[in-house]
């Protein structure tokens, strides 16, 4: 009866997924979204060079471009209530801890929505449930090259199972192939490969057990427009002697260039 419970100042926070997709897509349209429900992005096509014959009029091409619309119709929130007794008796700053978790909840929601866009790419390689092979990666790169996709800002978003499979490949981990200075088998970290920025996350669409929708894409394949960045509201509810915290975000996402992205069917 003389041995009280002692609470540690340290806490066990729930683990969080590595959120990597939102930072890998085009967010350049956000300045145009201060008002309104949509952002319309015009397209500009290529023109043809023609041979000029003497004493003949030149031919003018007729421009009939289409627009891609980014609809800003996603309004997400996360909320939590903290009773006064918890806040008073807790040795840690509970309110501060959960404010951080509110931000993570909204960030994960955005990344999750973007992950669903991978399945919208019309081109795919690989087989669900089987790790993406080196040949699959090269095939995806060829599809991008064939479409004249710029060489910079290319990303390979993969599941942890895909990372492990790549660490086992000499071409991805052996210094004879990747040069000195990178030691994936020692650090467990994959460096850039084939001009791709590599990122690993558990936050991918998994059609079934052991399966994952990975992707190789250029930044301009997908667009994210956050019209209202996460905004937190805090008020005291006297009826329940509780602090109420809520955070909201308004955004939209859209596939912009289908041939700039490749769905890699693989393992999870």
Regions from the PLM with identified roles:
Residues 49-52, 90, 165-168, 207-208, ...:
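Short helix/loop capping segments that flank catalytic or ligand/cofactor-binding pockets
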Residues 234-268:
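Extended, compositionally biased alpha-helical segments that mediate assembly or anchoring
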Residues 1-68, 72, 228, 261, ...:
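N-terminal "assembly arms/tails" that initiate or stabilize quaternary assembly
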Residues 66-88:
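Short acidic, glycine/tyrosine-flanked loop/strand segments centered on an H-E-D-like triad
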Residues 84, 158-160, 249:
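Short, structured patches in soluble enzyme cores that scaffold and shape functional sites
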Residues 85-151, 262-268:
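Alpha-helical scaffold segments that mediate packing/assembly in large oligomeric complexes
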Residues 35, 39-43, 138, 143-228:
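Extended oligomerization regions of viral-like shell subunits
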């Amino acid at each position: 009866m003389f041995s009280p419970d002692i609470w540690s100042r340290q806490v066990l926070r729930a683990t969080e997924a590595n959120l990597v997709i939102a930072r890998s897509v085009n967010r350049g349209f956000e300045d145009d979204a201060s008002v309104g429900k949509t952002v319309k992005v015009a397209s500009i096509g290529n023109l043809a060079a023609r041979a000029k014959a003497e004493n003949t009029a030149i031919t003018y091409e007729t421009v009939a471009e289409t627009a891609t619309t980014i609809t800003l119709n996603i309004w997400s929130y996360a909320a939590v209530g903290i009773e006064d007794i918890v806040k008073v008796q807790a040795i840690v700053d509970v309110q501060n801890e959960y404010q951080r978790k509110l931000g993570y909840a909204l960030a994960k929601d955005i990344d999750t929505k973007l992950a669903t866009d991978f399945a919208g790419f019309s081109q795919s390689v690989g087989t669900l449930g089987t790790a993406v092979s080196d040949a699959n990666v090269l095939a995806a790169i060829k599809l991008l090259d064939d479409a004249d996709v710029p060489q910079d800002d290319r990303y390979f978003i993969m599941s942890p199972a895909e990372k492990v499979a790549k660490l086992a490949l000499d071409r991805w981990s052996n210094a004879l192939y990747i040069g000195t200075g990178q030691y994936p088998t020692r650090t467990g970290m994959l460096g850039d490969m084939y001009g791709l920025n590599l990122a690993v996350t558990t936050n991918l669409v998994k059609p079934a057990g052991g399966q994952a929708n990975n992707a190789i894409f250029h930044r301009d394949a997908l667009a994210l427009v956050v019209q209202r960045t996460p905004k937190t509201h805090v008020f005291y509810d006297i009826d329940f002697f509780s602090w109420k915290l809520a955070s909201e975000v308004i955004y939209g996402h859209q596939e912009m260039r289908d041939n700039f992205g490749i769905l890699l069917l693989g393992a999870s």
